[in-house]
Amino acid sequence: MSNHHAYQMSNHHAYQMYAHITWHTWKRVGCLDAAAASDVESAVTSACQASGVRVLRSAVLADHVHVVVSFRPDIRLSDFDRLAKSVAATRANRRVPGAVRWARGYFVTTIHKRDLPGVTRYVADQFQRHPDLIPKKSGHNRML
């Protein structure tokens, strides 16, 4: 559906569920360079395909990730988060061993449809809010 405010349908169920998920690197180390950020974005896409979650907006910064999603009622967002983090770290660490390590856990809050535009705008504005955390295009940031 092109309108993410409409109800979604799945196996005789109608639903309208949204969440804002964030997770960060171990000790908030700014280890996500541009290549690792690309790995995170593709890992989130893979996790979405595997778990039935749909990304509405995301932002990958040097030390944390924001994702606004819609999801079915039978989805466990903890499974989505675990898969996205695992795939992202695996991909990034193939290029530079030990480059990306995530902190345990994540933050998630549900979003009412009336608040969805504001939350997606907040996530879209992350690079303006944190210009010092925009992933760099060159070099390999390694964790100490």
Please give the residue ranges for each predicted region.
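Basic nucleic-acid-binding interfaces
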Residues: M1-L144
